A protein has these predicted regions:
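N-terminal beta-alpha lobe that positions the nucleotide/phosphoryl donor
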Residues: 2-330, 334-353
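Structured, non-catalytic alpha/beta "coupling" segments that mediate domain-domain communication
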Residues: 84, 133, 142-150, 392, ...
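Catalytic cores of soluble metabolic enzymes centered on carboxylation/carboxyl-transfer
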Residues: 315, 354-588, 682, 716, ...
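Long, charged amphipathic helices and adjacent flexible linkers at domain junctions
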Residues: 379-387, 499-503, 507, 629-660
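Conserved bacterial/organellar gene-expression machines centered on ribosome-associated P-loop NTPases
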Residues: 450-456, 461-473, 647-661, 665, ...
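Structured functional modules or segments
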Residues: 649-724
Length: 724
């Protein structure tokens, strides 16, 4: 976790040592061209933001959040020599953030509304522990006006903006009125609340399709849907309204013009209680699925200096209009001509804040805490530059082959992040053995890289993703790894429609060339040889000399080669000479072990990195290459001769059953046994991580059997409904 410090610093003396180190090490070094140089990653990178040990501070802060953001806040608190209190649900009792905090209190069961969203029980924890301030992180109560006011009424500092600012900007209907008065560029739309689906259709026709239907209190992509016609307006209004009530406890809806194919660019603002406010430049957040960000970067390849200045100044205008202080983010839609339109303001720390920290040298959590204590900002707008490039990939427990990422659950049986690679930062709240549950966001890690330019940051990201070991849960690394080398992304030609445009049939995994397939086959054969040699050494009764070479038929789908592997050694260096169908020889380093998750070797002298996901005793070898998992079959030559006569396994008729594409909770079932249905008709809704997913039939027919009921928890792959 690796972000800058060890997770074991609980003693005050250790914290003071860390604080002094941070204070002393923040003098920036400069090169001959006066560009600031720093190393990003474990050792810290806040060259513009020293911690002053003589400055007044809170003695104890309660963190009203969980997971990676709680860990992130604890780290800065440690550097400031501030004690921390973690509040947690019962299922989080063994989580990393609980272990990292100085104190921890259980506040209820797994359901967020009974624990992390329970304002009164969190306030009780504040009183019990004597915490002077509360940091809400992001999500949960971070933009809850009532919670911020309750804390103020109890003389507890809310580490964020005032409750009035939260109210003004949190209500997306009211925020648009304020933004228009502040001369901020606006999207055409309807300024009032849309009460029901009938009014939604009327307003949508007045604005003109397509429209965006969104929750007034929404965020994180929840409660948002696009409608292209009256039918979609009715359906999506009801789904979004239900989702908003479930996620935010507020089902008010608004409708605005949908700008097709825009960029999503946001500006970080930071203000104090003395009227000083600045912008810390932009973050490009256009790579999204279901209106949720997947990859972010700073700066944006699209903005020129003048557009950056105009957008930043409008963000500050809006913040000034509501007397804003603390960290906040103003989000804009930007069209192809660099026209920009206000979207919303998030009155909290953003998930993607690390990329801003990397390119500005500012610790946003440190500044939020300082501002809450009443201190002035120590830097002005002219101090904020753009230094280098930073990219963040959100590593989720999701299946990227299903709608670019439907949630996955399970236990992390093996886990090693790539934080040992220079210029890599891993913000995570999990360790090996952690459980990814249905109840919370499926984020595993925010993987962030830094470089002198975009190309360098992307190269480091590729290495980091290739080296990231995650076992036990399905994850979205295959999609992330493919995106960062895809031609359009590399050129900077992106928009919020990037994923459906680049992958119109959905993500299918890395598409390999024949030479890449042959490399996989060759390595799988070498793994089989190492396994055979190991097995032979364990069998004491084995007689005779070991074979000089090993012959196999290796298959990857329909692609196969006959391979002969000869182990050799020259000048103390062990090699495998791999004969591929008698046409070419590949030399592969014999420097890896069968127990290695990550295999860094040379193919004909060129560096090559793969992961060995699993292997078994009957020749099945699963490799991970460029993020994608490949299942190979390695058979000795004699065994391969008998495979054509083996019986094939009978396949399930998928057109006659509806299978849950993810783990979740059944919110509704809209059909009955014996009912005739059409192709594509909605039959049920399954909710996971507060996102509602409408499931439809794959063909016309009659409902034969319904295996579920409302409120039931279902697993990924469970048969829900059968058709005759």
């Amino acid at each position: 976790m690796h972000f800058f410090w060890s997770t074991g610093l609980r003693s005050s003396s250790a914290r003071r040592l860390l604080q002094l180190k941070r204070f002393q090490s923040t003098k920036a070094t400069t090169s001959k061209d006066n560009k600031t140089l720093f190393t990003y990653g474990k050792d810290g990178h806040y060259f513009l933001d020293r911690i002053d040990p003589t400055e007044s501070k809170f003695s104890k802060i309660l963190i009203a959040n969980r997971g990676e953001i709680a860990c992130r806040i604890i780290r800065t608190c440690r550097a400031m020599d501030i004690k921390t209190v973690a509040v947690h649900s019962d299922v989080d009792s063994h989580s990393l953030f609980v272990k990292m905090a100085d104190e921890a209190i259980c506040i209820g069961p797994a359901q967020a509304r009974l624990s992390y969203l329970n304002e009164d029980i969190i306030l009780e924890a504040v009183k019990k522990t004597g915490a002077e301030a509360v940091h809400p992180g992001y999500g949960f109560l971070s933009e809850n006006t009532k919670f911020a006011k309750k804390l103020a009424d109890n003389n507890v500092e809310f580490i964020g903006p005032s409750s009035k600012s939260i109210q003004d900007m949190g209500d997306k209907i009211h925020s648009k009125v304020i933004a228009r008065k502040a001369n901020v560029s606006m999207i055409p739309g309807y300024d009032g609340e849309v009460k029901d689906e009938v009014e939604c259709v009327r307003v949508s026709n007045d604005i003109g399709y397509p429209v965006m239907i969104k929750a007034s209190a929404g965020g994180g992509g929840k409660g948002m849907r696009v409608a292209w016609n009256d039918k979609e307006a009715r359906e999506n209004f009801l789904l979004s309204k239900s989702e908003a009530a479930s996620s935010f406890g507020d089902d008010r809806m608004l409708v605005e013009k949908f700008i097709d194919n825009p960029r999503h660019i946001e500006f970080q603002v930071l203000g104090d209680k003395h009227g000083n406010i600045i912008y810390l430049n932009e973050r490009e957040c256009s790579i999204q699925r279901r209106n949720q960000k997947v990859i972010e970067e700073a700066p944006s390849v699209f903005l020129d200096k003048e557009t950056r200045r105009k957008m930043g100044e409008e963000a500050v205008q809006l913040a000034n209009a509501v007397g804003y202080y603390s960290a906040g983010t103003v989000e804009f839609m930007v069209d192809s001509k660099r026209n920009f339109y206000f979207l919303e303001m998030n009155t909290r720390l953003q998930v993607e804040h690390p990329i801003t920290e990397a390119t500005t040298g500012v610790d946003l959590v440190h500044q939020m805490i300082r501002v809450a204590k009443g201190h002035k900002l120590r830097f002005k707008q002219e101090d904020i530059g753009v230094r280098g490039w930073s990219i963040e990939c959100r590593v989720y427990a999701e299946d990227p082959y299903k709608s670019f990422g439907l949630p996955s659950i399970g236990r992390l049986t093996s886990y090693k992040d790539p934080s040992d690679i220079p210029n890599v930062r891993c913000d995570s709240g999990i360790t090996e053995g952690s459980e990814i549950s249905l109840y919370y966001d499926p984020l595993i890690c925010k993987l962030t890289t830094f470089g002198k330019d975009r190309q360098a940051a992307l190269a480091t990201m590729a290495q980091a993703l290739d080296s990231y070991v995650i076992r036990g849960v399905t994850n979205n690394i295959p999609l992330l790894r493919d995106i960062i080398t895809e031609q359009r992304f590399v050129s900077g030609d992106i928009s919020t429609k990037y994923l459906p445009q680049v992958y119109p049939e959905g993500f299918k995994g890395k598409q390999l060339k024949d030479t890449e397939r042959e490399s996989l086959l060759a390595l799988a054969a070498c793994i089989a040889v190492k396994s055979a040699i190991r097995d032979r050494s364990f069998k004491q009764s084995t007689k005779g000399m070991a074979p000089k070479n090993y012959g196999y038929e290796v298959k990857l789908g329909d692609f196969k080669r006959h391979i002969r592997v000869t182990p050799t050694e020259k000048d103390g260096v062990k090699l495998f000479e791999v004969d591929m169908d008698g046409k070419q020889i590949i030399k592969i380093d014999d420097s890896f072990k069968l127990g290695d998750h990550v295999i860094n070797i040379n193919f004909n002298g060129q560096p090559f990195i793969m992961q060995l996901f699993k292997m078994d005793a009957i020749g099945n070898v699963t490799l991970i290459y460029l993020g994608t998992k490949y299942e190979l079959r390695v058979l000795p030559e004699r065994a391969a001769k008998y495979m054509p006569i083996m019986p094939e396994k009978k396949q399930l008729d998928l057109a006659s059953v509806l299978i849950s594409p993810m783990p979740g909770i059944v919110k509704s079932v809209s059909v009955k046994v014996g009912q005739r249905v059409t192709d594509g008709q909605e039959v049920c809704v399954v909710e996971a991580m507060k996102m509602q997913n409408k499931l439809t039939t794959g063909r016309a027919g009659v409902i034969k059997n319904i295996r579920i009921k409302e409120g039931e928890t279902v697993e990924d792959g469970k048969i829900l409904i059968e058709l005759e």
